[in-house]
């Protein structure tokens, strides 16, 4: 038996190491000597070397020797060696190494000198033919030293505290942006002027020329994708100077088309077709140049060739349809041009035909959720501007269907500006809006904003007659500004759109995005919340609210809502008006005169109510009553106003007025919980308990969510005499948020009324048998707070002694222990000493008993000793002196 104990380690070990979890007993000479596991020895050696369990040099050395004997080539035996230096070698070895390095350096220099490309440092007179690396901050080589000197000469002096108080963040940021734009423009121009259009290819092989041409073409592609078409043209020219290819000509033609250099683009397309006849891209781009040069027949020929090769080419089909339409419209114009007469476009006013009507879609912003926003169909009704044009006015001029700003050919080219002004004057707001929508969809936001501005300028004098149309135009122009990054212009247009059409969703969303871009998160939060009030299904607004909530919590802390601007109240009819518009009839007025006062009264009512609620929160009850009085003048059937005013009367002690308001509220809504509860408080304040209309039990039955009524019901039951046979029925009360139409209830709203009867509530505690540990803990905590020894003794009588450790759980405190001992001594020792003995026995088995016993003072232990003395004096058949003495030892007395 003893041998087995020696072979096996004891049950209680000394733990393990942090690394490898090796038992501490294995870090021993005897174990290492007998161990033949190489992996185990390597782990032990690693732990010993780390020193996490202490430093034992002799044990470490012994482990190394043991591991050397078992595995001489083990990795654990390897030791780190520092990098070799000159002192690590002999003089001969170091001289040989040094000579080898020098010979290698000289050989590399000779190899560089034999290369074809010259070294600019050795030949300063010869310029480097290769362009510099592309970048916004590239500058001449000669200016590097001067710039570095100027930078080192400047010293930045830190600002003092008084200057920081006057620091305007937005102004400084705008200055930085302006400086950055100016520097960027200057650097780009300087960079373009330094790029040479030709590459010296003398002496290069075809492979090297191909490599240089592809490299320059790649640079041109990068410049083209970034929108720098001038730079792209230069790099494509450099590529063509190295090796002419059809691809480079095609690419340069596309860049020239972007720059509207039609003749240069046409030449490049023809050269590409000379190198590769039938090239699809060259034919397409030559057709584009023909189209803009009004050579429609040539464009049709090229496009038909493309469609013969690729019948499914969508771009060719679309361009061909446009060219055919232009060709068809230009036929009468060509006849008129032969006569040499100019047709003046005039607009006929006061015509019976409303030719200016146009059904256009309000374009969508990319940031708006498509499913939630949708295209809102609006009819742009142009009054006194649209009319029937004469047949002469309907006859289009040459190139009338072209894009704005394109030059026209033929006899009309002598006065292009005059024609452009006439054409713009003839365009109706509907045409301008539709053209702006097309430009917006094509990504030309600045041009779209110009079109919307023209439509706004025509409709602005009409004022409120076209408020809806103006609101849409302002909203569209705001979307263009938002895309361009002009957030302040976007905010101004959205404000104007909301003045014309309050609570429109799109202006609110776009203004919120602009505020968020400017980091004005509080204003953005208010706009997003307003959008969600109108339509809670908009996912973009919901996600943005969650994101901005996290940002405001980090910035302002948990009280960030107090710093928000006031959130406007959305009328109940507003969502229906915005999202479900009725069928529009041009003959009817958009809003009759009779509806204006109703909307005004509703807004005024809501504003007065919110002001009153805010005054209640600020405890300014008299001013709140005046606000509620004004609300009742507008709407005398608002039940919430009566209950709110009753609350103010209760706070001011005017119980009679509060009772009258509650009666009126109950006449409107007989099941109103707050009115019933506040009527109860008013009647109790009047000491008229016999004439109560509603008691708290009825309130709880009406609304189980009313926490205050349930709490008052518990107080009432506590003060009532307890019934002997019937056990009380318990009601679960869960506290939830109140409705949004009234200000939230506060637990202290009846504090002024409850002061009068606080003495009645301080009666004896009714104790019943607890069902679980939670109820036992609640009752015992209440008894301990009141120091009620009689109630504690009654609770111990109801409690079985063997259940006491479970019911106490880990909630035993020092004052509870002393109260239990005192209640046993005062009320139970003389009546039932055996029950006291059992309670003392099981009390010693409760959690935290030993800790509480160690924390008791000397006086408290003397009181406990008196309990045991009384228990010894009591005569009980089941108690002996040995039992009481054993209990004394458990209580350390």
Curated annotation (Swiss-Prot):
GTP binds at residues 630-637. Testis and sperm. GO terms for molecular function: GTP binding; hydrolase activity. Residues 403-415 have a biased composition (Polar residues). TPR repeats lie at residues 213-246, 247-279, 280-313, 429-463, 471-504, 506-538, 605-638, 639-672. InterPro entries: CiliaryAsmbly_MitoImport, RPAP3-like_C, TPR-like_helical_dom_sf, TPR_rpt. Residues 112-155, 324-344, 349-368, 373-437, 704-756 are annotated as: Disordered. Residues 734-744 have a biased composition (Acidic residues). One of its GO terms (biological process) is single fertilization. It is found in: Cytoplasm; Dynein axonemal particle. The modification Phosphoserine is found at residues 351, 703, 739-740, 758. Keywords: Cytoplasm, Fertilization, GTP-binding, Hydrolase, Nucleotide-binding, Phosphoprotein, Repeat, TPR repeat. Residues 112-126, 416-437, 708-733 have a biased composition (Basic and acidic residues). GO terms for cellular component: cytoplasm; cytosol; dynein axonemal particle; protein folding chaperone complex. May play a role in the cytoplasmic assembly of the ciliary dynein arms. Binds GTP and has GTPase activity. Plays a role in fertilization. Antibodies against SPAG1 interfere with fertilization. This is Sperm-associated antigen 1. It comes from Rattus norvegicus. The lineage of its organism: Eukaryota, Metazoa, Chordata, Craniata, Vertebrata.
